[in-house]
């Protein structure tokens, strides 16, 4: 038999041995391909989130998941166009879920402004009728238009003189005159031009309007006043430390007596701080009373770092519910009920959505809808009393959350993905996220704290940094007062003017009762003219 006709036979074991390298190679390639796909998806998530952060809308109130029958944004005009459609009137114009508000009238815009009438009357020379020689008589006047005018800020120097009197009779009878001298009002700062109105104006512009002192210096110069930024900084720090600090401490004591406190923090840079380089990051912490609290309080506190011992120290003596974003540092706070933030949980799902997601069944979309449903349920009982809200949560909200966490356990996301972040956040925070169900006065999110700290974040973009620790501490004091005033519906400048005018009369150690009468929620403050926003 020729060699070519011979058959080569292999046993099963030999065949397995021959293909083993090929099988191993295929398996290795499959694993490598899966890993590359996972990395690609992860990079696409990062890119999509970066584009969303830069170009997308920031609001979380609307759903980002479109059903198949929803129209494209860019085709909406062509799809809906109808030449026979009636124009909506101001009274009937409606949008999804609510009726559009009517435009504000001129009366509403100008209701808090003084009004001066400009009557264009006939001069005496024209009161004689050119047709019959009779005399014109006024039979009425008509409003033709209104104008909003600006009266530029004016400045002046007030010079206080005390008067001295001597008794003539005492001098004649005894040879010594009885002398009395009038007392001038106590100054805000000795040997300084600073007045309550000027310091209140500087503080309001910086801490409410976000105008840095360097820019204020230029504004003053245009008005003919040479007021340096260094002088203004000195005024702010001295007034905050000498006069406003007792109010700040009183507000803090009131805050620690509340049943619910929100907490958040953000970065601040302090140039001149011991044992720290100028470029290092410090922290501004924010503590606020709950949404359903009777007293709306916002307290800012400067600290050199983000250590958990900072909130632990600040909240010493507090034993209520603490609402945070899940930062582990807050776990050092003992004897409190830690409550989570569902807005953060929902945000995680939003970040996990694939770019341009339109499929209702995507896991991120499902998680997002669970959270959105929770917010919708809560909104229905926003005006209910505490007891009714607690019962509603136990009967209606609890089943939804039990379903949500059961669904979470069925998800097995890729490691390192945004989807894994969303799942892990909710599972790790389950106890904190469920805590609000046992209370009727605990909000479901930490949005209140985020909104309260936002003015500081916006202002920081303008003034960038604090020069010294004293400056940072003083900024915390002023921010606390103006944000607490705003939270209580009080106009910030009017409030600062009031307290800076009154505190010098109370001295360096005002009593609890005296400080309480200067709180933004006190009737004595709320009923003052021009104090309401």
Question: Where would I find each of the regions flagged by the language model?
Answer:
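Catalytic center-proximal scaffold of phosphoryl-transfer enzymes
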Residues: 2-6, 126-128, 137, 162-166, ...
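Short, flexible loop/hinge motifs at secondary-structure junctions
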Residues: 1-193, 262-263, 290, 324, ...
């Amino acid at each position: 038999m020729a060699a070519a006709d011979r058959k080569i036979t292999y046993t099963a074991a030999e065949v397995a041995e021959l293909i083993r390298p090929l099988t191993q190679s295929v398996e290795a390639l499959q694993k490598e391909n899966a890993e590359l796909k996972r990395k690609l998806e992860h990079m696409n998530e990062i890119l999509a989130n970066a584009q969303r952060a830069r170009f997308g809308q920031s609001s979380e109130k609307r759903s980002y998941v479109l059903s198949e029958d929803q129209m494209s944004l860019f085709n909406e005009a062509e799809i809906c166009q109808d030449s026979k459609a009636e124009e909506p009137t101001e009274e009937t114009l409606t949008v999804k879920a609510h009726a559009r508000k009517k435009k504000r009238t001129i009366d509403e815009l100008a209701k808090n402004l003084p009004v001066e009438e400009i009557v264009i009357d006939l001069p005496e020379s024209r009161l004689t009728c050119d047709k019959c020689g009779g005399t014109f008589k006024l039979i009425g006047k008509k409003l033709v238009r209104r104008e909003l005018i600006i009266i530029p800020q004016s400045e002046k120097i007030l010079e206080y003189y005390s008067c001295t009197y001597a008794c003539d009779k005492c001098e004649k009878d005894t040879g010594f005159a009885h002398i009395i001298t009038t007392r001038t009002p106590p100054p805000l700062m000795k040997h300084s031009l600073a007045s309550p109105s000027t310091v209140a104006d500087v503080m309001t512009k910086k801490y409410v309007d976000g105008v840095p002192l360097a820019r204020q210096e230029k504004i003053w110069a245009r008005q003919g006043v040479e007021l340096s930024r260094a002088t203004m900084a000195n005024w702010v720090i001295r007034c905050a430390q000498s006069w406003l600090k007792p109010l700040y401490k009183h507000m803090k004591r009131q805050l620690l007596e509340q049943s619910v406190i929100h907490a958040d923090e953000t970065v601040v840079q302090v140039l001149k701080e011991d044992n720290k380089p100028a470029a290092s990051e410090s922290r501004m912490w924010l503590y606020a009373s709950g949404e359903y609290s009777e007293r709306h309080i916002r307290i800012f506190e400067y600290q050199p770092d983000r250590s958990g011992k900072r909130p632990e120290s600040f909240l010493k003596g507090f034993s209520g519910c603490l609402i945070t974003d899940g930062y582990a540092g807050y776990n050092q706070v003992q004897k409190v009920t830690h409550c989570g933030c569902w807005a953060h949980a929902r945000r995680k799902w939003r970040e996990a959505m694939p770019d341009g997601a339109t499929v209702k069944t995507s896991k991120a979309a499902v998680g997002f809808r669970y959270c959105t449903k929770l917010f919708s349920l809560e909104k229905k009982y926003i005006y209910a009393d505490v007891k009714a809200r607690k019962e509603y949560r136990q009967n209606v909200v609890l089943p939804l959350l039990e379903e949500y966490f059961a669904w979470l356990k069925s998800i097995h996301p890729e490691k390192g993905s945004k989807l894994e972040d969303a799942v892990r956040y909710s599972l790790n925070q389950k106890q904190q996220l469920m805590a609000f169900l046992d209370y009727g006065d605990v909000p479901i999110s930490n949005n209140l704290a985020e909104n309260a700290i936002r003015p500081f974040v916006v202002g920081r973009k303008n003034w960038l940094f604090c020069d010294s620790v004293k400056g940072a501490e003083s900024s915390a004091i002023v921010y606390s007062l103006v944000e607490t005033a705003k939270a209580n519906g009080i106009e910030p400048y009017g409030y600062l003017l009031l307290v800076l005018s009154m505190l010098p009369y109370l001295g360096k150690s005002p009593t609890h009762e005296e400080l309480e009468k200067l709180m933004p929620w006190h009737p004595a403050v709320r009923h003052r003219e021009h104090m309401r926003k």
